[in-house]
């Protein structure tokens, strides 16, 4: 459902921000 999608999006967003911070 949408909740699962939002959870995945949040996880992906965190990873994305982490990549930006590390570069």
Swiss-Prot record:
- Domain of life where this protein originates: Eukaryota
A GO CC term? extracellular region
Q: Where in the cell is it found?
A: Secreted
The positions making up the signal sequence are none
Q: Does the keyword rRNA-binding apply?
A: no
Keyword Secreted applies: yes
Where do transmembrane segments lie in this chain?
none
What are the record keywords, sorted?
A: Amphibian defense peptide, Antimicrobial, Secreted
Q: Which GO terms describe its biological process?
A: defense response
**What does the tissue specificity note say?**
Expressed by the skin glands.
Family, per the entry? Belongs to the gastrin/cholecystokinin family. Magainin subfamily.
Q: Function of this protein?
A: Antimicrobial peptide.
What is the protein's given name?
Magainin-R1
């Amino acid at each position: 459902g949408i909740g699962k999608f939002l959870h995945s999006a949040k996880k992906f967003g965190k990873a994305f921000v982490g990549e930006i911070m590390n570069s």
